[in-house]
Amino acid sequence: NWACVYCQVENLTRGGPPPIDLDMLERELEGFLEEALHGDFMRRDVPPEARRLMDVAFSGNGEPTSAPEFADAVACLSAVLERFNQKGKLMVRLITNGSLMHRPEVQLGIERLAELGGEVWFKIDRAEAAAVVEINGVPGQPEKMAKNLKICATWAPTWVQTCWFALDGVAPSATSRSAYCNLLRPLAGELAGVHLYGLA
């Protein structure tokens, strides 16, 4: 539902996602964990220094919370992690633009994620309406972003994820930096922190 200028997803289209086949999701999660934990996948395909599972992330080609099955998918993951004795051991993350946090079904998914010891990475690249349009390709609503961020932080540990870069050779202005800090400042005590990164 966003179209960020730095997005690398090919043929990105707006609109809702296809339905999630929860039975298939469960089979695929079980199959992968079986191979990764008990099979030869790590030895066969992963360099020795990287042979560990880091997380299970809800992210990718679009906004994960836009799937009506999001909360059920988190519950499915919880059951699979329990069977593999990975609950509380393998980090669970949601990487989101936060635009749908007002929906009760999304909040249920966030609550379930928190019960797994998971966390949310909540995207805020800019905090001025015009800059949000320019960078994220959606109407800029800083007040709504702040409200949704607060909702998210109420349900689960929440990191703000920010991509900061020059556009056409022009770095974000002092006004833009101040707007960003002013948006986050009232919530600083409720957030896990900020992941600040640039373009590779």
Question: Model-derived features: where do they sit?
Answer:
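Residues immediately within or flanking Cys/His clusters that coordinate Zn2+
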Residues: N1
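Short cysteine clusters
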Residues: C4-C7
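Conserved Radical SAM active-site core
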Residues: V9-L116
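Conserved AdoMet/S-adenosylmethionine-binding subsite of the radical SAM
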Residues: S66-L199
